[in-house]
């Protein structure tokens, strides 16, 4: 890509990113026209291709930028410093809300990109997220204390159940247009409280 993109004002960079996230989250990779992205960003198609040489490069840049934004925001929120699973979830939720207020279509883009089948990009997307997904699906990497949970609970199964419930929620909502941030936050708080009631060990 052309490094001059990073010399643009932050507001213009964000407008281009948001235009890409919006168009790609609503269409397949193949059916997402760069002209529509340029229009949404308020720039010409030729200028968009000045910064990104082709659609594939722009698509993969959006994917990597999403990972960068997410990791930085999670670090700022202290998610990697917590050992309490549900406190980590609450902090992660607040981080997700912060991100979505800046980039409204970013979560829908991630879901769409993960399931994208176009051979032009799917191999690189899957390779990129393999390590990330291995961590997210593996409760053993989170240093969970069995004493905090109901006796005999399979922590790996519990964590996978919560992971797939969250992913399924995002997939379902993304199929019906733009995700509502406030609604998503309320729904996830309810899910976390439900999980706490059924999985945490009760005193006495």
Regions found by a protein language model. Give the residues of each.
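Short secondary-structure transition hinges
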Residues: 97-137, 148, 156-157
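Hydrophobic alpha-helical connector segments
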Residues: 61, 76-102, 155-162, 185-188
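Generic hydrophobic, amphipathic alpha-helix propensity
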Residues: 12-20, 37, 62-70, 136
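Gram-positive cell-envelope targeting signals
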Residues: 1, 45-50, 107, 165
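N-terminal intrinsically disordered/low-complexity leader segments
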Residues: 1-10, 203-204
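Hydrophobic/aromatic-rich alpha-helical bundle segments in the mid-to-C-terminal region
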Residues: 111, 122, 144-193, 202-204
């Amino acid at each position: 890509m052309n490094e001059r993109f990073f010399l643009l004002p932050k507001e213009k960079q964000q407008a281009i990113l948001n235009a890409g996230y919006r168009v790609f989250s609503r269409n397949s990779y193949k059916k997402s026209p760069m002209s529509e992205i340029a229009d949404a960003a308020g720039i010409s198609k030729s200028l968009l291709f000045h910064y990104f040489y082709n659609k594939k490069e722009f698509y993969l840049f959006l994917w990597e930028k999403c990972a960068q934004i997410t990791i930085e925001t999670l670090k700022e929120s202290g998610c990697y410093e917590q050992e309490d699973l549900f406190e980590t979830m609450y902090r992660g939720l607040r981080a997700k809300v912060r991100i979505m207020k800046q980039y409204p279509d970013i979560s829908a883009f991630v879901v769409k990109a993960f399931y994208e089948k176009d051979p032009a990009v799917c191999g690189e997307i899957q390779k990129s997220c393999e390590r990330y997904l291995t961590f997210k699906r593996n409760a053993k990497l989170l240093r969970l204390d069995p004493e905090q949970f109901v006796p005999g609970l399979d922590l790996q199964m519990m964590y996978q159940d919560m992971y797939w419930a969250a992913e399924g929620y995002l997939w379902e909502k993304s199929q019906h247009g733009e995700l509502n941030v406030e609604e998503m936050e309320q729904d996830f708080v309810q899910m976390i409280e439900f999980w706490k009631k059924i999985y945490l060990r009760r005193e006495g």
